Amino acid sequence: MSDKLMNTLQRLQQLRQRELNQATSQLAQQKQLCQRYQNNINALGSLTHFALMPVAGAALMTNSASYKRNIQRVIDWQKQEQVLANIEAGKLQTHLQQQACREKIVAVVLEQQQQQQQVAQGRREQKITDGLAAQCWQRRQAG
């Protein structure tokens, strides 16, 4: 196996690892976004509980109802955004798994090639050792 091919495999593995790291980072950011939506929904939900207190007067009741309605619209919008964010997180999770598989394949191939290269180097060294031993033996026999 040539050094050029080994260098190419090593560079490919580095690229795959970088892609895997980017996919991991993107997924983490997306999960944080999903959590922010959930936190927003919870906070907005608590605002509607304050509006449930009894109010006196028609104007205050109308104002309270309008407030609750508007808060509920924002909650519904946040829930829709959360669903979309969860879908995107699922896609990113799938992409991450694909990137991990691609990186692992290259890592395994590189490791196999390195092992083959070490075995070949060991054979070359053994041939040299055997050749030197044969020369020594022949010199002793001749001398």
PLM segments and residue spans:
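Charge-rich amphipathic alpha-helical interaction elements
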Residues: 1-143
